[in-house]
Amino acid sequence: MFEIPDIQLNQYGKPARIMFLAPYAPDAPDFSKKPYTGNGGYPQYHYNIYKAIQDIGYDVVSSSKPYSVQFAKGNVDYVFSLMNRFAMSRPEIFISSYCEFIQIPYLGAPPNIRAIAEDKLLTKMVFRSLELNVPEGIGLSGEKGIPAQAPFPGPYFVKKRFGAASGGIREDSICSSWKAVDSCARRLMEEGHEVLVEQYCEGIDVTVPVLGGENPVILGLSLIHISEPTRLRRIS
C-alpha cells in the first residue's frame, strides 16, 4: 500500500495551478469531451485525466492547442502535457523544450531524453551499444529508398521510426515477405514518415507504472493484452 501525497501548494499557499495540454483536452468555454471518429478513445482518456486532476483539487486550465504553453509563465505553476503528436517536425520535444526555456516545471523527461526515446532507431543503437539484445532492424526514408533485397531474414515488423503508442500500426505492419515490407514502407513514406523495419520476434508487452519523482511509487508490472489479428497468428 502507499499513501496518496497531499495536494501541492504554490508559493501563495493555494493548490498549484496546472495547465493540462493534450490533443483532445477540453477547451473553453464548455470544457466538454470532444467527438472522435478514429480508432482508440483519446477524447475520453484526455477528458478523464482533466477531470481527475480537477477532482483532486487542483486549479486546472485545459487546452488542446500546443501554443497555449507560451502563456504558462506567470499564470500556472506546472504544465501537465500529453501533447506528443501534432503538425510539426519532432513535436514530442516542443512542450518540454519551451518549458525549459521559460523555466516552469512540466510532466515527463527532459527534451533530450524524449528525443532519444521517440526515435526507435536511435534507441535501438543505444541498447545495442550497451550489449543488450535487440532485433535486427534498418531505417528507411524517401531519400535512402528501399533495398531491393532483404538485409535480414523475416518475418518483419514495419512501423514509423519516430513516435510512440503504436501510432500508424496496422495489420499489414506484420510482413511475411520483403515485397510486403516494400508496400507497407512506401505507404508510410508517402504519408511523410521515416520508417523502421525490424525482424519480428515473439514476446510480451510489459509496463511498469512509476508515479512521482524523488519518492516514486512503483505500481508493479502490467501485462498488456492485445487481440492478435489472424495474420499475426499465422506468422508467429
Predicted features, each with a name:
Residues 176-227, 231:
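Phosphate-binding site of ATP-dependent enzymes
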Residues 80-81, 105-107, 134, 217-220:
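Short hydrophobic/aromatic-enriched beta-strand-loop microsegments
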Residues 1-106, 112, 141-147:
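ATP-binding N-terminal substructure of ATP-dependent carboxylate-amine bond-forming enzymes
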